[in-house]
């Protein structure tokens, strides 16, 4: 109930039709309000095209009907590659000739 009331305040009411504007002192101000609300875009907002690498990845694997489990595989493979590179740097590079073992 409260949510419905909060959302209803975001949508402006029809203030007045331009036909009913008379010679009242604030008629010009109401005409400006009517013109402002008529000039607002109507309908859904156009989709924003992803332009960064992370935004394209998110659009490809997370948004809409494209949601999948591939990012989990990417994360796991990244951890494995990172772990192996650290293991190589800190340990395996010292044993290239295998004379120590």
Swiss-Prot record:
A Gene Ontology BP annotation from the UniProt entry: proton transmembrane transport
Keyword Mitochondrion: yes
InterPro entries, sorted: ATP_synth_F0_fsu_mt_fun (IPR019727)
Presequence positions on this chain: 1-6
Subcellular compartments: Mitochondrion; Mitochondrion inner membrane
Claim: Metal-binding is one of the keywords in the record: no
CC annotations in GO: mitochondrial inner membrane; mitochondrion; proton-transporting ATP synthase complex
Function: Mitochondrial membrane ATP synthase (F(1)F(0) ATP synthase or Complex V) produces ATP from ADP in the presence of a proton gradient across the membrane which is generated by electron transport complexes of the respiratory chain. F-type ATPases consist of two structural domains, F(1) - containing the extramembraneous catalytic core and F(0) - containing the membrane proton channel, linked together by a central stalk and a peripheral stalk. During catalysis, ATP synthesis in the catalytic domain of F(1) is coupled via a rotary mechanism of the central stalk subunits to proton translocation.
Database matches in PANTHER family: ATP SYNTHASE SUBUNIT F, MITOCHONDRIAL
Similarity field: Belongs to the ATPase F chain family.
Further remarks about this protein from its record: Present with 14600 molecules/cell in log phase SD medium.
Subunit structure: F-type ATPases have 2 components, CF(1) - the catalytic core - and CF(0) - the membrane proton channel. In yeast, the dimeric form of ATP synthase consists of 17 polypeptides: alpha, beta, gamma, delta, epsilon, 4 (B), 5 (OSCP), 6 (A), 8, 9 (C), d, E (Tim11), f, g, h, i/j and k.
Protein name, as recorded: ATP synthase subunit f, mitochondrial
UniProt lineage: Eukaryota, Fungi, Dikarya, Ascomycota, Saccharomycotina
Gene this chain is encoded by: ATP17
